[in-house]
Amino acid sequence: MQKVDVLIVIEHVARELESACLLKVALQQRGYLVAIDGIYPNKEKLPTRYQADYLLIPWAYHDHDMDFWECFYHHSPNIQIINLHHEQYSGNDSHNTTLPQGRSRKIYHLSWGTRFTEGLLTSGVDPSHIIPAGNLRLDFYRPPLTGLSQNRTILAERFELDAKKDWVLFIANA
């Protein structure tokens, strides 16, 4: 079993890995020992691989989800679970299905903005368990991280695309 301060669990590599790496570096610079691991393909083994103080998870909507995440309490009874909420909008303004229900309201929740924070409060999350932080993936569009991404000209050359045409890019796990 690996002892870490922070375990960041990712679900979708294409969506979450870059921001998990960014978060890992930021936490390591503050002296934390951090591991990143994927929830799949060995979801059932994940809670037995790590002993952590903080567990950063991609989602926790209801008790069924918490049945899994709470398995981490077995080896880390004081672990703090933080829901990064990689999905904060469900496309339905009258009822956001990404808001926590049941026991998932008791953990910490990252909020990208005031609207989601209001939804968290309405769903019964304690205000002290809401972390307003913005979307981690957007940090790559702000200095000094903008230089990490390749610009349109470089991408056009690399993939033999016409830089003057509109592109439609599809993100997928590779």
Q: How would you describe each model-predicted region?
A:
Residues 1-2, 164:
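Short, surface-exposed loop and linker segments with low hydrophobicity and enrichment for Pro/Ser/Thr
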Residues 3-149, 157, 170-173:
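Active-site and donor-binding regions of nucleotide-sugar-utilizing enzymes
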Residues 162-174:
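Conserved donor-binding/catalytic core segment of Leloir-type glycosyltransferases
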